Amino acid sequence: MSNKAKKISWTAALVAAGLYAAPAASEVRLMSYNIHHCAGADKRVDVRRVAEAISREKPDFVGLNEVDQCALRSHGIDMPEELGRLTGLHATFAQAIPLQGGGYGNAVLSREKPLSVLRVPLPGREPRVLLLCEFADFWFGTAHFALQETNRLETVEIIRRVVNEKAASKPMFITGDWNCQPESAPIASLRTFMAIISNEKCRTFHGFKKHAPDTVSCIDYIAVDRGAAARVKVKESHVTPDEMTSDHNPIVVTIDLTKGPGHLH
């Protein structure tokens, strides 16, 4: 009997004996949302309205951009804490800049409490930040790219270094408002080490304006590092049209994540 045949026979025996487990998959619902500091089309800051928009999607992990924390323009509300309370999720905040007595940046809402948190400064005329949270099975985070192309290209290279360093042992999902279209140079560069799993053919940014149905402005994304892409099966991906709550639409991806190779118990 060849070595290959022996290996197949041994694996079959383990399966029959209940000692070998096939890779387990778990369903995870991911969301990305630029919330425009909870200021809607009516210019009213309404945290509850944003929380309801999030809760309707029933996400497990949410990356939020343009989040105020205790800033004067949003009535001193600690938005990460309040959104966490209203959605029943853990809240983690990373400040990009100080703002009116408080801060402004990104947040992650999560069903699980993070094991660790990484904050990485990103370039821009207005400084930006990458927020990454480590969980039991993967990293999840969000980045808000700058408006300038050169800064966006620099940001992609910073993210590449982080992925190379941190994604060796766990998959890494990065979401966010990246301020560039799918055919842009920064996205082309990012695709060399990340696989975009969100819908790229739907409008994610509307700017509180009506648009022709055949025009698309996709600048918000959900992606996974290419090293883990084979372990991710996209079950469903959509963008929810909402021209009241924020100037961006929420984007959602439901995946099956294979936790790892078969193993002996």
Question: Which ranges hold each PLM region?
Answer:
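N-terminal, active-site-proximal structural segment of metallo-dependent hydrolase catalytic domains
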Residues: 2-14, 18-86, 98-102, 158, ...
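Structured beta-strand-rich core segments of catalytic domains in phosphoester-bond hydrolases
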Residues: 27, 42-43, 67-139, 231-241
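Structural recognition of the beta-strand scaffold that forms the well-ordered cores
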Residues: 31-32, 61-65, 108, 132, ...
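Active-site metal-binding loops of divalent metal-dependent hydrolases
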Residues: 33-35, 67, 143-145, 176-178, ...
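Surface-exposed cleft-lining segments at the edges of enzyme active sites
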Residues: 37-39, 118-119, 143-149
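Sec-exported extracytoplasmic/periplasmic mature domains
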Residues: 55-59, 84-88, 92, 114, ...
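Metal-dependent phosphoester-hydrolase catalytic domains
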Residues: 119, 150-151, 157, 161-173, ...
